[in-house]
């Protein structure tokens, strides 16, 4: 069985997979999470798997934005993103570039390739060598994401809404 299936090795679904989505959401919003309520389950238990396989969470931000995210090992739908704002809703389905704005399907002009691990490591090493800031993410961004992850894990364990502690 994979190392990922062991809590002591991977930390579970939130640190292993959830961090990427939560980091993107916080970046889009431009703010940190303030509180979170999470529900976690293992709906398909196996003796060699001791991590949750389903996580659902709701987080709030200081501006009042609600973040609602579900992570599951039991579907093959890929990514679905919806952002509801004051001027409408954007829905992005999967990696194929199907975009809806207020229910109307829009074409995405080109596929965007995200940088792989090699380019991320190269950027990090170049920034350190040149004494310049990183291009996108910072330690502060990572810390905000992990604070949300840890608070969500605690909420999942206790069944209580948790304050996200930064600092």
What role is predicted for each listed range?
Residues 30-34, 66, 88, 133, ...:
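Generic structural signal for secondary-structure transition and capping sites
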Residues 17-20, 116, 140, 144:
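A generic structural signal for residues located within well-ordered alpha-helices
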Residues 126-167:
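C-terminal helix-rich "cap/oligomerization" subdomain common to oxidoreductases
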Residues 40-54, 60-122, 166:
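NAD(P)-dinucleotide binding in Rossmann-like oxidoreductases
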Residues 11-12, 109-112, 132-136:
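Active-site rim elements
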Residues 1-47, 159:
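Predominantly a Rossmann-like dinucleotide-binding segment in NAD(P)-dependent oxidoreductases
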Residues 21-22, 117-125, 149:
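A general structural signal for well-ordered alpha-helical segments in protein cores
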């Amino acid at each position: 069985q994979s190392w990922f299936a062991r809590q002591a090795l991977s930390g579970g679904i939130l640190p292993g997979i959830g961090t990427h989505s939560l980091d993107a959401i916080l970046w889009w919003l431009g703010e940190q999470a303030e509180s979170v309520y999470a529900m976690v389950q293992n709906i398909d238990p196996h003796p060699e798997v001791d991590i949750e396989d389903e996580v659902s969470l709701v987080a709030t931000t200081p501006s009042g934005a609600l973040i609602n995210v579900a992570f599951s090992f039991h579907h093959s739908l890929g990514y679905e993103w919806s952002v509801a704002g004051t001027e409408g809703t954007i829905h992005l389905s999967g990696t194929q570039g199907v975009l809806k704005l207020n229910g109307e399907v829009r074409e995405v002009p080109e596929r965007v390739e995200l940088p792989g691990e090699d380019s991320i490591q190269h950027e990090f090493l170049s920034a350190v060598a040149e004494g310049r800031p990183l291009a996108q993410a910072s330690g502060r961004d990572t810390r905000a994401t992990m604070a949300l992850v840890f608070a969500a894990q605690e909420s999942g364990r206790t069944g209580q809404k948790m304050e996200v502690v930064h600092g």
